[in-house]
Regions:
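Second-shell loop/turn segments in exported
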Residues: 53, 118-122, 152-159, 170-180, ...
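Extracytoplasmic ligand-binding site segments that recognize negatively charged/polar headgroups
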Residues: 124-130, 140-171, 202-222, 266
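A short, structured surface patch at a secondary-structure boundary
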Residues: 55-112, 116, 120-124
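Alpha-helical, coiled-coil/dimerization segments enriched in small aliphatic residues
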Residues: 82-89, 95, 215-241
Length: 321
């Protein structure tokens, strides 16, 4: 009887130790998560997450912003910025992460020991990180952020749309075990899209002055999908680059000037239309020229909500008669 009693006590102690010991991360018990993506060349591929990533390398400001919005900022161990002026703000958000303003080479990325790499397409070129397929083959999940390139020629890549931004947010929510947070962000986007304001039909131009060239953002990019959703039309051309003469004939009611960088770069971009050659343009003559950051209309991720609000506000301002 004594032996039975002591055996019983020993079993109770064992169960108690198990119950009081460190609890396993529930994320390790989940089934593999698979999301659709594509490689550097536009070929479809699946990215599998066997567990919630704990050491994430993010290449691109909007990717960082999206993961922070999902509540997964603490999983970011390093970030490479597309917009260097955000470094101070993002470093404050991610005090334990390494922040880079120049692309990483393959060896430097390997040294960071990431278990997941999220990045704009250009970072997966052979002279930088290498294609996502090579990382996946090594057992490291790698994902090209939706609609992050190539711009402006899509080639075989999926269209850059509102839906593609929502898909990116949803996929990151799945991968990081933050489905509810992703759904909350998407719900806010949907609510903004369903808002009742009546926007007058009008023609709109998105244009960037870059290194002596004039680039038009066409219908196959995110800005085109947003403008269509709001019942307006986007001025578009067969080629992304147009001549000064073609711009001088533009009859758009609103012109969005695309710029990279901060306040100084914004003012330089706006000054391009101060040229007397453009003073007759309807948008210029009526003061309907608006700055918009490149990052607001190319792969904005969770910042899509702010982009929608800003563009809608501009479309509602001083409607054409």
């Amino acid at each position: 009887m004594k032996k039975l009693f002591w055996c019983f006590c020993l079993l109770i102690c064992c169960f108690g130790c198990v119950a009081c010991g460190p609890q396993q991360d529930k994320s390790s018990d989940r089934q593999n998560i698979s999301v659709n993506n594509y490689n550097f060349f536009g070929d479809e591929q699946k990215v599998i997450f066997k567990q919630v990533p704990q050491r994430i390398l993010v290449c691109g400001n909007s990717g960082v912003e999206t993961l922070v919005a999902l509540g997964a900022g603490d999983k970011i161990t390093a970030a490479v910025l597309t917009e260097a002026e955000d470094k101070g703000r993002l470093q404050a958000l991610l005090p334990n992460a390494r922040i880079y303003t120049q692309p990483l080479q393959l060896e430097a990325a390997v040294a960071l020991q990431p278990d997941f790499i999220l990045g704009w397409r250009r970072y997966f070129a052979d002279n930088q990180l290498g294609d996502t397929s090579s990382w996946i083959a090594k057992g490291i999940s790698a994902y090209i952020q939706d609609a992050s390139g190539p711009v402006p020629a899509k080639g075989r890549f999926p269209a850059c749309t509102i839906a593609s931004e929502k898909r990116f947010i949803s996929n990151m929510g799945l991968a990081l075990g933050r489905q509810q947070q992703a759904q909350d962000i998407i719900q806010k986007i949907d609510s903004e899209l369903q808002a009742a304001e009546k926007i007058p039909a009008q023609k709109v131009l998105f244009v960037e002055f870059l290194n002596g060239n004039i680039e038009v953002f066409g219908n196959d990019l995110l800005c085109g999908d947003i403008i269509r959703h709001y019942g307006c039309s986007l001025a578009s051309y067969s080629a992304p680059f147009i001549s000064q003469e073609e711009l001088m004939e533009m009859q758009a009611a609103k012109i969005f000037i695309v710029y990279h960088g901060g306040e100084q770069q914004k003012q330089v971009a706006l000054a391009q239309l101060h040229n007397p050659l453009y003073k007759h343009l309807p948008a210029v003559a009526s003061g309907q020229v608006y700055p918009i950051a490149y990052k607001q209309i190319v792969a904005p991720g969770s910042d899509l909500l702010g982009t929608l609000k800003y563009i809608k506000q501009c479309l509602l301002a001083n409607p054409p008669q």
